[in-house]
Each structure stands twice: as C-alpha cells, then as structure tokens.
C-alpha cells in the first residue's frame, strides 16, 4: 500500500519546553503536518487515554492521522487511525486481528531482519533507523547509516520512513537511499516554532520529490 503522508511527527512532551503538548501539536498541524504518533511511553493507560482522546479530537479537526504507540487498546478506545508497534510489541498480525482491516499499523525497525519480519507479519509501513545520530534514539544503539537503509529498501516493498537525526540538511541523502518519507521527533516537537518547522520540512520534501519526478529515467 501507499501512505498519504511523508512527514510523520512523533510526540515527546519532554521536548516541548514546558508548553502543553496540545499547543505544540496544533502548531505542527497549522504548519501542514498530517500524521502523528502519540508516543508517551512513561504514561500508564489511565493517563495516556485522556491525552490520546485530546490528540484524536485535535487531529480530526485538521483531517490528520493519529497513531498510538504500542497500545492497541488505547488506539481503539479513542478511535485512532492506527497503532505504531515496536519489535517487542504484539506482532502486527495479532494487532490486525484486534484492530480490523481499516486501521494503519506501523512498525519501528532497526535491522534488515526486523524489517522483513514486520513486513511478513502484515505491517502497513516501517519506520527505520536511527539513520543518523540523535539523542532520542541513542538507547537503540549506533546509527544504522544510509547503506542499511538502502539494503532494507531493496529487500522490502512496504513504505519506509527514515528516523534518527533526519533534518532539512540531509533529506536529499535519505530520499536518495530509498526512504518514502521521514519520521521526526525533536525536529518538530522540540523546535522553537513547530509550525514553521513543519512547513519547512514539508516544503523541502515536496521540492525534492518534484525535482526527482522531473529527472529523465535512466
């Protein structure tokens, strides 16, 4: 399948500089972002639920997609567009049985084997990385690099969003390595101006794609 977004904003309320997450997400929405993953792993379900409900109402207002990290139950409870899994979550095939056919399932992967496993289990798209160094992904090990992204792109037919230190300056490299889009945390959630950051990333993505489309086929 194809995705209807190429910028996937992942939340982290610890990066908002004290601003309510709602205000930061709304600023990103005003900047054109149309896909979000609510990823607040420290919150128990009872606290995550009202935040997820708030995010669902907000994203619906803008016609944007909302996926919930890991919690299939919370995703269903707030009528989210899907769930985002990790390699330690429920398998995508099991999540699909619970969610039904109409919701998205994304899976975070860090190796070719993980990417192939997620594809085999029925994921709709992959987030692969960290491609470059970023503090938020440091616990997941060293950056995998662009070569690993190329290998996964050649082996897996699903849409792939690159994550980990991805920014305007290296977008060309990431797209050239085969990414269909990008997933970002600090580049938007931690930005001084999340609206402008979203606008800038989206404009750069559109420009790069337009340039690629205008190039003659080899």
What are these regions (language model features)?
Residues 1-90, 97-124, 141-143, 147, ...:
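Conserved N-terminal beta1-alpha1 strand-loop-helix module at the mouth
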Residues 136-138:
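Glycine/threonine-rich flexible loop motifs
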Residues 177, 181-184:
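C-terminal binding/interaction regions
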């Amino acid at each position: 399948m194809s995705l209807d977004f190429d910028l996937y904003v992942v939340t982290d309320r610890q990066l908002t500089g004290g601003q309510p997450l709602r205000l930061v997400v709304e600023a990103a929405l005003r900047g054109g972002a149309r896909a979000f993953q609510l990823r607040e792993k420290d919150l128990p379900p009872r606290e995550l639920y009202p935040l997820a409900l708030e995010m669902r109402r907000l994203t619906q207002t803008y016609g944007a997609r909302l996926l919930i990290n890991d919690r299939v139950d919370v995703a269903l409870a707030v009528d989210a567009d899907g769930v985002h899994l990790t390699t330690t979550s429920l398998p995508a095939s099991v999540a699909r049985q619970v969610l039904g056919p109409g919701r998205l399932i994304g899976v975070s992967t860090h190796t070719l084997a993980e990417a192939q496993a997620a594809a085999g289990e029925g994921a709709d798209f992959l987030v692969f990385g960290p491609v470059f160094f970023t503090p938020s992904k440091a616990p997941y090990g060293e950056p995998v690099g662009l070569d690993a992204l190329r290998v996964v792109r050649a082996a897996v037919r699903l849409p792939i969003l690159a994550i980990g230190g991805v920014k305007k300056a290296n977008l060309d490299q990431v797209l050239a390595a085969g990414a269909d889009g990008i997933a970002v945390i600090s580049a938007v959630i931690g930005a001084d101006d999340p609206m402008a950051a979203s606008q800038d990333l989206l404009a750069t993505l559109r420009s790069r794609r337009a340039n690629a489309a205008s190039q003659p086929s080899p």
